From Swiss-Prot:
LRAT domain location: 138-233
One GO cellular component, as annotated: cytoplasm
Keywords: Cytoplasm, Phosphoprotein
GO biological process, one term: cell motility
PROSITE patterns assigned to the protein according to its UniProt record, in alphabetical order: LRAT
Subcellular location: Cytoplasm
Species classification: Eukaryota, Metazoa, Chordata, Craniata, Vertebrata
Gene3D superfamilies in the record: endopeptidase domain like (from Nostoc punctiforme)
Name of the protein in its database record: Protein LRATD1
Keyword Cytoplasm recorded: yes
Family according to the record: Belongs to the LRATD family.
Role: May play a role in cell morphology and motility.
Primary subcellular site in the record, as a coarse category: cytoplasm
Amino acid sequence: MGNQLDRITHLNYSELPTGDPSGIEKDELRVGVAYFFSDEEEDLDERGQPDKFGVKAPPGCAPCPESPSRHHHHHHHHHLLHQLVLNETQFSAFRGQECIFSKVSGGPQGADLSVYAVTALPALCEPGDLLELLWLQPAPEPPAPAPHWAVYVGGGQIIHLCQGEIRQDSLYEAGAANVGRVVNSWYRYRPLVAELVVQNACGHLGLKSEEICWTNSESFAAWCRFGKREFKAGGEVPAGTQPPQQQYYLKVHLADNKVHTARFHSLEDLIREKRRIDASGRLRVLQELADLVDDKE
């Protein structure tokens, strides 16, 4: 598509809600601990992004034409996007003292939290990329759903866990999300090569609820890219039997450099709580959405 896009994220913080929106407190998921970590993270050079790979469509996948280079959009000026102001909670996650996830802006290893119109994403993506799709709406509206994760397989197509089924859909039509971003670097695990990521996704097409061992779209998409059993439901030892260095800690970064930390016995539980916070209205658009989405050309 070759669009030159403004980066469209400004971040404000708001206080973390103290209760579950349903009114049911899940104590086992919200065990606060007086456990804080140094701001210095481990050297992550072994977790860098892989080289680019040409990806062929495995059996069962629709053809995935090669996507335009993710840098191609720098060479053209077309449909500049209005800047959005997001009120978005930032997270980091640890297993013991090892950082395994970071959605925190700033610093040398800060996450890129820029969001783009869904119609612009194919120009920024390559097969095997992880996408986070967002439903942004004006501040007075009810909270949007939790962010939806998917694997990009080329040709404007994604594979994702949606409504209890693993399916392949057009990126432009998936859930009518209006913006998204590439989130390959948020999890700090070593990624599989792009061809294997696409094969993992395609190999599970058509599975339905009773056959699926992931509890949400993020866990499925992340498993496709990293291949770690911890993303599967029940993929870890029973709760309460791990030593502290094997337990998980979610840090929620609040205003004034405050951090709320909670402990979990599995990555599955940590992801569930992180997504609950995301779905509780922390993601808001504070200005007009006019001209948000490019023409679908």
